[in-house]
């Protein structure tokens, strides 16, 4: 119980790699000793926080101007989504830790559209209704503008100005994000 409390207290989405490691640790602990219900509200808050982060990344991709300078920024945003989405799914199964989520993540990453209905049905039985409404569109193969509408429906603080988001990113504690944003602004 103390380990779970300590790990949850260390969750900080400014460093996604550390965040991912902490969620991996929480999942490993939950598979041995289920996380009690009073921690589930904290985990639900984390699910919303990380889902909002993924929708924000998608929104930035959607707002990214289609020009010759977009390659590095687009690659960074896609990489961040691919790095963050599995952690969101792992957070979502902490209350049912025996779920073979790693297999499902691998299936999602493979991009096989024939397996998508199976995955969505599985998540139908694992995630709460609210979690499904937020998480499933991130798994489905949707156009960016449709995913953008869903993000704006669920989260009121979605970015609306790409240049403003770039300026914020320059001052990010994530040095890679800061460098890429600065590089993009200079060109």
Model-derived regions: residue spans:
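Alpha-helical adaptor scaffolds
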Residues: 137-175
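Boundary/linker elements of alpha-helical solenoid repeat scaffolds
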Residues: 1, 34-38, 68-73, 82-89, ...
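Alpha-solenoid repeat junctions
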Residues: 1, 26, 30-34, 92, ...
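Amphipathic alpha-helical scaffolding segments comprising HEAT/armadillo-like alpha-solenoid repeats
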Residues: 2-12, 32-48, 67-70, 97-106, ...
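Extended repeat-based solenoid scaffolds, especially LRR ectodomains
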Residues: 42-98, 103-108
């Amino acid at each position: 119980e103390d380990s779970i409390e300590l790990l949850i207290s260390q969750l900080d989405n400014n460093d996604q790699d550390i965040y991912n490691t902490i969620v991996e640790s929480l999942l490993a602990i939950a598979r041995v000793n289920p996380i009690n219900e009073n921690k589930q509200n904290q985990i639900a808050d984390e699910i919303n926080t990380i889902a909002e982060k993924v929708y924000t990344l998608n929104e930035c991709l959607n707002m990214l101007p289609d020009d010759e300078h977009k390659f590095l920024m687009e690659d960074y945003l896609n990489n961040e989504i691919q790095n963050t989405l599995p952690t969101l799914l792992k957070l979502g199964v902490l209350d049912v830790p025996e779920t073979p989520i790693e297999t499902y993540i691998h299936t999602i990453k493979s991009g096989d559209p024939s397996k998508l209905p199976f995955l969505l049905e599985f998540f139908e039985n694992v995630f709460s209704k609210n979690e499904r409404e937020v998480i499933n569109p991130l798994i489905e193969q949707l156009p960016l503008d449709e995913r953008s509408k869903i993000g704006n429906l669920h989260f009121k603080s979605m970015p609306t100005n790409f240049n403003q988001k770039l300026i914020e990113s320059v001052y990010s504690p994530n040095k890679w994000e800061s460098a890429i944003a600065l590089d993009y602004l200079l060109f």
